[in-house]
């Protein structure tokens, strides 16, 4: 090829140089197989007619003969040179190549035809060009197969950015200047040469050929290389039909261009057939560091190779996103709003118009640069006239998403002068749906409910695990990055002393939020319209209620079980649990709000033998709110002990501690919340007598009970004989039990302070408060003596151990009888003691 360029045969030509058509060896083999080739005679006629029109209109337009197109359709198709597969459908052929032959070029050989320089690395070729061909821009690469070796031959075109075709023979007129040609994306950028030093061929060697404008020739060379990269063996005349409807901008030399090497030293082609890598790329083209580490372990390849493989695949598919777009796409994919769609090839019918398009149909700032997740749309055009050849196939962009589209498209411009009967038009793009602008995560303000959930979790652990993060995502609706950022900021603020998060302040915020939440309409999914789910049957509601009593936040296994048993969808179950949690919280807050200071004073003065208004209110709200109501019941000794132990440790339990207490005691969660509310109020008034005992003696035995507390509730085995007269005599004289006198009285009577106070009739307020607390003396009703009807509370001898066991048995019996019977047993104690005195 170099010897042909150095031919010294003189020839009178125009300033536009002749571009020779290089046909590789594969084309000759394809001709031998019977695939259609151009017909020179018909091409001559079309070329002559086109020259006449172009001389009048000062334009150059590509023309292909209809007979050639029909001959190609009848004879040829698309044949794979690596296997016997052949088809006439471009979509099927492209899918076959992508699936069956992902690796095409292995160890390419780069050859510079001007200098006979040979290398196996593209970097070496680039260095060679910078040293021996400085400032050269018109490089051309031709792919040749020689003895199972792929050769990329580099040559220099003498086009001077103007391309035209001159033919020998009489009647050939001079044509106007051609269309400027730019280099392919593979070539190095640089300034064009000022003078063309190449001499064209002899006139007798110039074969008559179709007139190809610059951009069409550019795409022919590029498509030739790309087709062979994908394992395609196409004909040169077939590639002549593909012309991008883009025009090079006038400032093309000022636009920065990046050369794309076909091979790098670190690229590992073995990853092209790795199913794990392909699936990961199809899910998201920008892997995180954690995903890279996982892929390194799964594929047994270095991380640097995986990074380069991902970058190459993104370049191959035309994906170029900014960091902001990557973050937004990752958030949308996490929220389930993006479905990863692989690039598809779609064939759409084109519209025909009789007008002449003088301006480019499609314009972009960079030639043939497609950004984002796009689909390739090939628009074949059928012509109704025998004098006009097949119109070029238009390359349009049908974007799946709008992440990568950097510049707007220019609409077609029509001129009033008709020139051709038919010409291809770009189909109008579908109207875009106006999407609301996405608010950055940092600009979104969190609601009070979201902050309350985050603070409650922050009190538990400043470094939440994945399970806690997913729970917060479900509860608050925030993204994972937002939750992580909030925790990071508050850890820093807590270390600096800027923010102090305590359980007391958190409880006040939760109460304020719950108070402001009354009267609102709740939706399980605030980002969408109110969900209209079908009504649930009683059996489904019962199954859901049973699961809710176990845990208000079901696990994944529990959700799968509920879906199987209830036949409901995951979304319906999540919605039901969300509404049920809100109903529970609002009911608890209503119970707490109803216990004001005014109502509490009225409830304290309630007479014996009657339920207080607080108990009536709690029972009524439980009946109306819960599907399976449970009235306020008397608490057993074990339940009271667990509640008191927790209260001594913290007066404001967390939701998790409430759930644990409900599971351990068997009480309703609302009843536990009410008990803590009452005891907090009593603690402020100083009427909680057992608080000091639980604070100073927290040691528990194997069963979870304080040894001293159990000892206090157990009667003494022995007591002095005169000890039985101390308590009635003390009550008879001062008629009132004082706290300071109690310390003197306890050593003389040889019993605990609690049993000593039980021997005396308590005030109405103390009786009511003790009953609301569920204190341990609820079960100490009067055990009447059948013979004398006189109750002795203090004097106990060794021989009365049977009576002690009977009295302890009556403890549990009295606890199960209810609040009304407890009041009657308390009232019976007064006349009995008075008779004894």
From Swiss-Prot:
Residues 427-439 have a biased composition (Pro residues). One of its GO terms (cellular component) is nucleus. Residues 317-446 are annotated as: Required for nuclear localization. Residues 27-77 are annotated as: Interaction with EFNB1. Residues 167-180 have a biased composition (Low complexity). Residues 195-358 are annotated as: Required for homodimerization. There is a cross-link at residues 64, 455 (Glycyl lysine isopeptide (Lys-Gly) (interchain with G-Cter in SUMO2)). One of its GO terms (biological process) is negative regulation of transcription by RNA polymerase II. Residues 263-446 are annotated as: Required for repressor activity. Residues 192-203 have a biased composition (Basic and acidic residues). Homodimer (via homeobox domain 1). Heterodimer with ZHX1 (via homeobox domain 1). Heterodimer with ZHX3 (via homeobox domain 1). Heterodimerization with ZHX1 is not necessary for repressor activity. Interacts (via homeobox domain) with NFYA (via N-terminus). Interacts with EFNB1 intracellular domain peptide; the interaction enhances ZHX2 transcriptional repression activity. This is Zinc fingers and homeoboxes protein 2. It comes from Pongo abelii.
